[in-house]
Amino acid sequence: MAIHLYKTSTPSTRNGAVDSQVKSNPRNNLIYGQHRCGKGRNARGIITAGHRGGGHKRLYRKIDFRRNEKDIYGRIVTIEYDPNRNAYICLIHYGDGEKRYILHPRGAIIGDTIVSGTEVPIKMGNALPLTDMPLGTAIHNIEITLGKGGQLARAAGAVAKLIAKEGKSATLKLPSGEVRLISKNCSATVGQVGNAGVNQKSLGRAGSKCWLGKRPVVRGVVMNPVDHPHGGGEGRAPIGRKKPATPWGYPALGRRSRKRNKYSDNLILRRRSK
């Protein structure tokens, strides 16, 4: 990721940084308008996810997560910014005239060629089934269900590792630290998702975060008792209980929120690390 630092003319530009060498000029046939409803509310209008709201209007880019252009070579034409995700996207021109967006693999540059299929080279950006990959391969955009498209390891900088193959299943170590089984026939893309340093970029000011649809974060201890279990008291008061709690009164730190008796419990060999 190429970072451009501003000259220190104002406090905002002194601390801010933007991505350079990445344009945002999407193709008209690969975008469509998307109504962003809710803003962290449920169907009754009650806040269920805090600190969300506002933000600039966005056009959704159609991303090819399935990579079903089999055995047809494509060339990376552009590397573009996508407002709907932290990762960059690449515009691919295939040999049969098809044009699609894919997630930008880290290290890929304009002019590189990619291909998807069953017997393709183990090269960055190529997509192939897990059964054809050697152990230790770094992968992203991993399918959970055959033919449904990649669902795992799609965020900026995400990378998983193929650590074992036995029977009909392959064992993967995911970015969260979770180790789980997936069918060997599912496909994945070789390499790591690009823009790995996005979490180190400084926005510089509150307005830049508002453009992204992120509202200010307020501590519960400075709220009123009606708004948060930590609220109330005179001056700087402690939270008034043994353990921290969420705004709805549930234990805040370390409580497991995964549903019990899920179908995938037998597929998870080791839970994700905190």
Curated annotation (Swiss-Prot):
Q: What is its main location?
A: plastid
Q: Name one GO biological process term.
A: translation
Localization annotation: Plastid, Chloroplast
Q: What InterPro entries does UniProt report for this protein, alphabetically? A: NA-bd_OB-fold, Rib_uL2_dom2, Ribosomal_uL2, Ribosomal_uL2_bac/org-type, Ribosomal_uL2_C, Ribosomal_uL2_CS, Ribosomal_uL2_dom3, Ribosomal_uL2_RNA-bd_dom
Say which domain of life the source belongs to: Eukaryota
One Gene Ontology term of the molecular function aspect: rRNA binding
Which UniProt keywords are listed? Chloroplast, Plastid, Ribonucleoprotein, Ribosomal protein
Q: Which GO terms describe its cellular component?
A: chloroplast; large ribosomal subunit
Q: Where is this region: Disordered?
A: 1-25, 224-274
Q: Does the keyword Chloroplast apply?
A: yes
**Which positions, given as ranges, span the membrane?**
none
Q: Which Pfam families match?
A: Ribosomal_L2 (PF00181), Ribosomal_L2_C (PF03947)
- Gene3D superfamilies listed in its UniProt record: 2.30.30.30, Nucleic acid-binding proteins (2.40.50.140), Ribosomal protein L2, domain 3 (4.10.950.10)
The protein's matches in SMART domains, at most eight in alphabetical order, are given as: Ribosomal_L2 (SM01383), Ribosomal_L2_C (SM01382)
UniProt lists the family membership as follows: Belongs to the universal ribosomal protein uL2 family.
Oligomeric and partner information:
Part of the 50S ribosomal subunit.
Under the heading NCBIfam families, the entry gives:
rplB_bact
Q: Which PANTHER family match?
A: LARGE RIBOSOMAL SUBUNIT PROTEIN UL2M, RIBOSOMAL PROTEIN L2
Protein name as it appears in the record = Large ribosomal subunit protein uL2cz/uL2cy
Lineage, highest ranks first: Eukaryota, Viridiplantae, Streptophyta, Embryophyta, Tracheophyta
Quote the gene name from the UniProt entry.
Answer: rpl2-A
